Amino acid sequence: DAEEIKADIKKFLTETLKLELSEEKTLITNARDTARFLSYDIFVSDNESLHEDKNGHTRRVRSGKVKLYVPSEKWQKKLMDYKALEIKYQNGREIFNPVHRTYLISNDDLEIVQQYNAEVRGLYNYYKIADNVSVLGHFNYVMKFSMFKTFGAKYKLHISGVRKKYGYKHFGVKYQTKQGEKILYYYEAGFKKVKTGIAKPEVDNVPKVYRNNNPTSLIS
């Protein structure tokens, strides 16, 4: 059983590799229970399906499938670490309130969008193999409105004014290059599960820009 396998591994590490097995970190968990590993929640889900046997009888077959989940506290903690979220309590319920990030207000408009894009893409790239990776849509919602409020605090605008200035459907910041004017858009690629392999990460290439007379903006 699992205890015997653990004992054999411990013996091999001690006698052959001269290493010590940490009892605190080497825990045996029932496959039906959730285990936390590398910031993923891992468990085996019971899937039942009907199959016909060789005699033509229909039988219910149960097969366990390993599931990887994004723990909700992980993406919530990221928001708190970025100071993009305040959690309020009303009638015993948690209310998520996106807030502006004071330490980004002095950055160029282009740098602000790049910062948010890098943080959203970074979390998605880490969890893209999770079965419930789509929950990062909640993370993205808070980040997007935090960005709106950051621009609002910078230019003394309401969210409606910010969206009117930079785009309602596609939020984008204009900047100048040798090839002319370009636009950097806020992340819009979604949060689909990646089945296998490691995809090449999408990043915002840092553009070469021409500054205007406004020292706090790269916008022409």
What is the predicted function of each stretch?
Residues 1-220:
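Non-catalytic terminal/accessory segments
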